[in-house]
C-alpha cells in the first residue's frame, strides 16, 4: 500500500517550449523553491544548473535534457517531482522526443510576447503523439508587449487546443505583480523582498472583479462540457460548485486530454512558479494514473503483453538516453514501468537478447549523481556498468521478456566531412564519434567508400557545430571541416518490369538465380521503406529464397543508381522466376535482387530528392521586400505573410536546405540584425533537372540518367 501511495505522489514531468520561452529559467526557479539550490542560476550569466554542458552555458541554450528530482509540499503532502528540462531548438528535437516518451505529463511554456512559435507547435504535436497531458504556462508576463489572453487565443486557433485559464494576470509588462486565482477567487501577489519565495493572498483588486468573474464563468463552462455532474450544477446554480469539485474536474479533464489548464507568471522576476508547482501536483498524472503499459512479445510481435504499474510485477524499464559522464563513464537514463531495479542486478535487454549488469544506480540532479540502492516502479533514474544498451531498448526480467514500443527518430538532413589534424587525433576521433553517435540517434557517422572521408550528419548546422565543439572539449580532438553537404535521396518515377538472371560457373558447384519482378514507386498510403509483394505461384521460386530476394532489395535501397544516395521508399513485386536444384542458394537470390534493383532503377526515370525546410522569418515591415527577394533567389516559395502583435511581419516559406547555408548571417545583413528566423524540416521534394545535373556532376554521379 505504501508503494502505491508513494506512486500517487510522484510526478514525471517535462518542461517543453520554443527556444527562449524561458524553460530553463523556470526549471531553475523550481529548483530554488523546492530547496535543491540555494542560489538562483541565471541562463544569461551561464550559471544555470540544468544547462550543465559548457556549450549550453556559452550559448545560453539547452542542448541535452537534464533530469532532476525535486520535492514539493502541497496540501501538507510531500510530492516527488522528476523534472526533465528539454531543448527548444529544432536541431535538438530528438531530446524532446526521447523525454516525452517516458513522461506522464508536461508543462508547455509559452512566451507572453511571442505566443505560439514554430517550435512550440512541433513539441505540442510530439506530446499529442505520445498522449502526454499538458498544462500551459505563459511566461515573461513582465516583458513589453506581454498579453496572456492573446496567447490563450493562439493555443485555441493555431494548436487546436482547449485552453482553460485558471488564473488571469494582475497587470502586465512592468506593472505585472501577481495573478487572480479563478478557483479560489483570490488575488496572489508576490513580494520582491523575498525573491518571490512568499506571496500574499488578498482580495481581488476592485478594477479586476468583473473580468475575473467573466473568466471564472468561462472556466466553469469549459469544465461543464467535460463533466456531466458539474454540468447539472452549472445550469442549476453555478455558485454551489465547490473549490474541490473544480479541482477534481480540472484534473479529470487534463488527464483525459480534453483541456489544458492555463497559468501565467514571470519566472525571471520570481512570480508564479509556486502556483505552477501546485498545479503540477493537482492536475498532472502520477504513474499510478497510467495503470498498465503495453508491449509485445519478443518472439511474436503480434502478441500484446501488459504490465501493471506495480512493484510486484516483473521488471520492465525503457532506456531513453545514453550519456557520457566525465566521472562515471557511460550513463543510461531509464524509466521503470513495473517491478523495481536494485543496484548490482542483471537485466535482460530485449533487443540484443543479452543480460546486462547495472552495477550502480543514481538519481540525477542535472549532471551530479546521488547514489541509490534501488530505482522503484514509476521512477526515473540512471545506471552505469552496462556494455551494450542503446536509446529505446527495453530492459526486463529474462523469464518475462517484453518489448516496449521504441522511438522514431528523423533522418539527418545535413552532413559535413571531418578529418583529424594529426595522426594522434585520428584514433581519438573514432572513439569520440562512436560515443557521440551512441548518445544521439539523429547523429550519424559514415565513411565515404570512394574518398575515404568521414562524413558526420545531423539535424542542422547548430547540431553539427555542437558535435565538433564536443569533440574538441571532451575528446581533445582537433579536426578540419569540409563545407556542409545536403543529405540527398533518390526516387524513381516509372514502373519497370524485368527479368534478371544471375549465373556463375567456376568449376564445381555454381550460382544460379532467376527473378521476374516489377519495380515501381511505393503506394501513397504505404508508410515503411520497402513494400514487398510475393506473387510467385507453384513454387517456381522456393519459399526459403523469397526472404533473400527481399533482403537484396533492402540492401540495394541504401545506394541509388544516380550517385549512391538512399531511396526512401520502393515497391517490388516478385512475379515469377526459376531456380536450380543444386546451384541456387540464398546468396544467389540476394545478389540477383541487387542486380535487378540496379537495372530496373536505371530504366525507371530516377530522380534526385532534396530536403525542403519550413522557414518562418520575423522582420520589420521596411525590410520585408529584401527578405522576400532574397528567398526568391534561394528557390523559396513564400506561402503566407502575417502581422505580429508587435508590428513586425511574419513571412512563412518553404525553401530547399541546399540554399540555406549561412542564411542567419545573410538575414542579419539585409535587415541590419533586426530579423529572426526559425527553420524546421518539412519534406523531401524533386530537385529541378538543371540543379540535379550540377549536384550529380560534383558527386561524380550518373548525369546521363537525368531526363
From Swiss-Prot:
Primary localization: cytoplasm
Ligand binding (GTP): 17-24, 85-89, 139-142
InterPro entries with a match to the protein in the record: EFG_II (IPR041095), EFG_III (IPR009022), EFG_III/V (IPR035647), EFG_IV (IPR047872), EFG_V (IPR035649), EFG_V-like (IPR000640), EFTu-like_2 (IPR004161), G_TR_CS (IPR031157)
A molecular function GO annotation: GTP binding
Family classification: Belongs to the TRAFAC class translation factor GTPase superfamily. Classic translation factor GTPase family. EF-G/EF-2 subfamily.
Function of the molecule: Catalyzes the GTP-dependent ribosomal translocation step during translation elongation. During this step, the ribosome changes from the pre-translocational (PRE) to the post-translocational (POST) state as the newly formed A-site-bound peptidyl-tRNA and P-site-bound deacylated tRNA move to the P and E sites, respectively. Catalyzes the coordinated movement of the two tRNA molecules, the mRNA and conformational changes in the ribosome.
GO biological process: ribosome disassembly
One GO cellular component, as annotated: cytoplasm
Organism the protein comes from: Porphyromonas gingivalis (strain ATCC BAA-308 / W83)
Keyword Transport found: no
Keywords: Cytoplasm, Elongation factor, GTP-binding, Nucleotide-binding, Protein biosynthesis
Pfam families to which the protein is assigned, alphabetical: EFG_C, EFG_III, EFG_IV, GTP_EFTU, GTP_EFTU_D2
Compartments, record wording: Cytoplasm
Name this protein carries in UniProt: Elongation factor G
Domain tr-type G: 8-288
Intrachain S-S bonds: none
Amino acid at each position: 500500500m505504501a508503494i502505491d501511495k508513494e506512486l500517487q505522489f510522484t510526478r514525471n514531468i517535462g518542461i517543453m517550449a520554443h527556444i527562449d520561452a524561458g524553460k530553463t529559467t523556470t526549471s531553475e526557479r523550481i529548483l530554488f523553491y523546492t530547496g535543491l539550490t540555494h542560489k538562483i542560476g541565471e541562463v544569461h550569466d551561464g550559471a544555470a544548473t540544468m544547462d550543465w554542458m559548457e556549450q549550453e552555458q556559452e550559448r545560453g541554450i539547452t542542448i541535452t535534457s537534464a533530469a532532476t528530482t525535486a520535492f514539493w509540499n502541497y496540501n501538507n503532502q510531500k510530492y516527488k517531482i522528476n523534472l526533465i528540462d528539454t531543448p527548444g531548438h529544432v536541431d535538438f528535437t530528438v531530446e524532446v522526443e526521447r523525454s516525452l516518451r517516458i513522461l506522464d505529463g508536461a508543462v508547455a511554456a509559452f512566451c507572453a510576447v511571442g505566443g505560439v512559435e514554430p517550435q512550440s507547435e512541433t513539441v505540442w504535436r510530439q506530446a499529442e503523439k505520445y498522449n502526454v497531458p499538458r498544462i500551459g504556462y505563459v511566461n515573461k508576463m513582465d516583458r513589453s508587449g506581454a498579453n496572456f489572453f492573446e496567447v490563450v487565443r493562439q493555443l485555441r486557433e493555431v494548436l487546436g487546443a482547449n485552453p482553460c485559464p485558471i488564473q488571469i494576470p494582475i497587470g502586465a509588462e512592468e506593472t505585472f505583480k501577481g495573478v487572480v486565482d479563478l478557483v479560489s477567487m483570490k488575488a496572489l501577489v508576490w513580494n520582491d523582498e523575498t525573491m518571490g519565495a512568499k506571496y500574499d493572498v488578498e482580495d481581488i483588486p476592485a478594477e479586476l472583479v468583473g473580468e475575473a468573474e467573466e473568466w471564472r464563468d468561462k472556466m466553469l463552462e469549459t469544465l461543464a462540457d467535460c463533466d456531466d455532474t458539474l454540468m447539472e450544477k452549472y445550469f442549476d446554480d453555478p455558485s454551489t460548485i465547490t473549490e474541490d469539485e473544480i479541482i477534481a474536474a480540472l484534473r479529470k479533464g487534463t488527464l483525459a486530454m480534453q483541456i489544458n489548464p492555463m497559468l501565467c507568471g514571470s519566472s525571471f522576476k520570481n512570480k508564479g512558479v509556486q502556483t505552477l508547482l501546485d498545479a503540477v501536483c493537482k492536475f498532472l498524472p502520477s504513474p499510478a494514473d497510467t495503470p498498465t503499459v503495453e508491449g509485445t512479445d519478443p518472439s511474436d510481435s503480434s502478441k500484446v503483453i501488459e504490465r501493471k504499474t506495480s512493484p510486484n510485477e516483473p521488471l520492465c524499464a525503457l532506456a531513453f538516453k545514453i550519456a557520457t559522464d566525465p566521472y562515471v563513464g557511460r550513463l543510461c537514463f531509464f524509466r521503470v514501468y513495473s517491478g523495481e531495479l536494485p543496484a548490482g542486478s542483471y537485466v535482460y535487454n530485449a533487443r540484443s537478447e543479452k543480460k546486462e549488469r547495472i552495477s550502480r544506480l543514481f538519481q540525477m540532479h542535472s549532471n551530479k549523481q546521488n547514489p541509490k540502492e534501488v530505482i522503484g516502479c514509476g521512477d526515473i533514474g540512471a545506471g552505469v556498468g552496462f556494455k551494450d544498451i542503446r536509446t529505446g531498448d527495453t530492459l526486463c526480467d529474462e523469464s518475462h521478456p517484453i518489448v516496449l514500443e521504441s522511438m522514431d527518430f528523423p533522418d539527418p538532413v545535413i552532413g559535413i566531412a571531418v578529418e583529424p589534424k594529426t595522426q594522434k587525433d585520428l584514433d581519438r576521433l573514432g572513439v569520440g564519434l562512436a560515443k557521440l553517435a551512441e548518445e544521439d540517434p539523429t547523429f550519424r557517422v559514415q565513411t565515404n567508400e570512394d574518398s575515404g572521408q568521414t562524413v558526420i550528419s545531423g539535424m542542422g548546422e547548430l547540431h553539427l557545430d555542437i558535435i565538433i565543439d564536443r569533440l574538441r572539449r571532451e575528446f581533445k580532438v582537433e579536426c578540419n571541416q569540409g563545407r556542409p553537404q545536403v543529405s540527398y535521396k533518390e526516387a524513381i518515377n516509372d514502373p519497370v518490369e524485368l527479368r534478371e538472371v544471375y549465373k556463375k560457373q567456376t568449376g564445381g558447384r555454381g550460382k544460379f538465380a532467376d527473378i521476374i519482378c516489377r519495380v515501381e514507386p511505393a503506394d501513397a498510403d504505404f508508410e515503411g521503406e520497402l513494400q514487398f509483394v510475393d506473387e510467385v505461384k507453384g513454387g517456381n521460386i522456393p519459399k526459403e529464397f523469397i526472404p533473400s530476394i527481399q533482403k537484396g532489395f533492402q540492401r540495394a535501397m541504401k545506394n541509388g543508381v544516380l550517385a549512391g544516395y538512399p531511396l526512401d521508399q520502393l515497391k517490388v513485386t516478385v512475379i515469377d522466376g526459376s531456380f536450380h536444384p543444386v546451384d541456387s542458394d540464398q546468396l544467389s537470390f540476394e545478389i540477383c535482387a541487387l542486380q535487378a534493383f540496379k537495372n530496373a532503377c536505371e530504366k525507371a526515370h530516377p530522380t534526385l530528392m532534396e530536403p525542403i525546410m519550413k522557414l518562418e522569418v520575423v522582420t520589420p515591415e521596411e525590410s520585408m521586400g529584401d527578405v522576400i527577394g532574397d528567398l526568391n533567389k534561394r528557390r523559396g516559395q513564400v506561402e503566407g505573410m502575417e502581422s505580429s502583435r508587435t508590428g513586425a511581419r511574419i513571412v512563412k516559406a518553404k525553401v530547399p536546405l541546399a540554399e540555406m547555408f549561412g542564411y542567419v548571417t545573410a538575414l542579419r545583413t539585409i535587415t541590419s540584425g533586426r530579423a529572426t528566423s526559425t527553420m524546421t524540416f518539412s519534406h523531401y521534394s524533386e530537385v529541378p533537372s538543371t540543379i540535379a545535373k550540377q549536384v550529380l556532376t560534383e558527386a561524380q554521379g550518373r548525369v546521363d540518367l537525368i531526363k
